């Protein structure tokens, strides 16, 4: 056995050890909230409102998608050696075939810049980026309560302005060293935005008694993926349970495939997301997605096959999550808990004030697992004033009834709300089973 092979085998053993560690670790409720926190930050900073659809299992999936054996290539081994101690993050991206192929093509930009003070540090280890996506790998050391991720993240361009992007971050990855946490920030570029010439990653403590901040600035090497973009026209129409979906085009980048679709405004249902969506090639390999952006005009993001373009590609799904458009708007009496309009079976079970916010509890039939949670776009009071509803949390069971889920929606600055309010549903856990498939012309 050569020294090189021994090195690969040793690395593989380390990665599989981390895989076992992930499979046995519990997933805290904070995992989902951490992802939602990143989405909310992005939504507030966008010039135009961006809605990011993500299934309720996505946060856990960011941590727990480890199936089968972990095999490593020389480029993959080199990547780990470039970023010591990053086996946890590497195990996570190992399930993203597109990112792994990008690494195999030496598209990783090493950064290695650290901001350290008062015994704590933040290091940006490296990035992978193209015109559509940027993945930022970082390491936290000595942070207070990193498992709670009590920090806000800002991404700034070379002029110090917020990037108009959406991004997510997962629950901090466990490490053999409890003082070290490894993670990544997954950034989407939309609406003509692109990677900046220079990027600043800023972490700010949410602790009101502290003004701690860590800032790392570095140039972005856009030449690594310059010109790497392939557009595949599709221009076909799907009809799923009577709902018309126009599939416009697929755009291939090194880090992802972007499928652009239009949902017919004349559809009777609001489609929140397509269920079990995947692209399948002639070898039966599945290229999956759990993220999309937009409303009627929507971009759906898949793993990239840029460096392994198939001969045949089929879009497959089992149906969709959606709701009749006439059930999206409702009126709610905060005193009597009476709901007028909305989907059948939705009930208000209580409310409470927390600081400046109002928390409204709803009972929803069924489970949030594997689907969309109840969420709202906004709340309007009797005077026409609008309030944001940035997030929801949930727990199983309505008293002794395990067939329902309690969803708690936070109305920002709504502590003084009284009487009747109007609410608009953004997502709801209503699934429609209607399998579909569509051939994508890879070489039109």
Label for each model-derived stretch:
Residues 3-24, 28-39, 66-444:
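Alpha-helical, hydrophobic structural elements that either
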Residues 45-75:
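Internal signal-anchor transmembrane helix that establishes type II topology
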Residues 36-48:
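Intrinsically disordered, low-complexity cytosolic tails and juxtamembrane linkers
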